[in-house]
Amino acid sequence: TSLPIIIIPAIISFLFDIYKYKLNIMKFTNTLIKGKLIKRYKRFFTDIKVNNSIVTAHCPNTGSMKGLLDKDNTVFLSKNDDPKRKLKFTLEIIEANKKLVGVNTHRANKIVADGLNKGLIKEFKSIKNIKPEFKFSSDTRFDFLCDKNIIEVKNVTLLRDQKVAEFPDAVTERGTKHLKKLIEALKQGYKPFVLFLTQIQGINNFKIAKDIDLNYYKNYLIAKK
């Protein structure tokens, strides 16, 4: 029995400042703020030019963000005025190569959860119980347990040829570990899935970037057998 691989495009539309997954609309709380990227540094920080000011925004993506970080790329920020927050702005989307790319990895699970709850993902239309952050073992958590289905979500932001999204954008030991653990779960009677959420505007094709992480690619092939 092979490990099912699911690829879901999350279409980003700025006509309404929303995330859109098929018929499902997931609105941002507030209108996004447009700016220009100056730089990203220390993984979690980005300097953004908004009008005539420079603001520091939280970068909620710890990956390499390969191909997205060119200076002066258009970006979209969300704003939170909670006084407890050190940074009021969060980097949500970057426009690169004329494509809008959702870079907030925290939103990936929210998009999938919304799709699960509303029955928009055909593989899981009949599920009854959705449990986020499923603890599979002492050192491994998966994103969702839906009845006996384990779902691990991977956020996809890499686009190198304008037609095909790719994962990963850097070597991912954690991703490889997840594949191996999902194979273990299969042997234990679970039905595990890898769900690649492609947050790139207008892209429906996907492949593994084997030139970036050959080990992940090899384990991906093992999982598919």
Name the predicted role of every residue range:
Residues 120-137:
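A short acidic/basic microdomain associated with nuclease active sites
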Residues 63-76:
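Short nucleic-acid-contacting surface segments enriched for D/E, G, S/T with interspersed K/R
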Residues 39, 79-84:
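Short, charged beta-turn/beta-strand-edge "cap" motif at the junction between a beta-strand
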Residues 42-47:
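Short aromatic-glycine-enriched beta-strand elements
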Residues 1-2, 13:
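Low-acidity, Ser/Thr- and Arg-rich intrinsically disordered low-complexity segments
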Residues 200-225:
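Domain-level recognition of nuclease-like catalytic cores that cleave nucleotide substrates
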Residues 85-97:
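OB-fold/S1-family single-stranded nucleic acid-binding modules
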Residues 35, 142-169, 182:
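Conserved catalytic cores of phosphodiester-cleaving nucleases, focusing on short active-site segments
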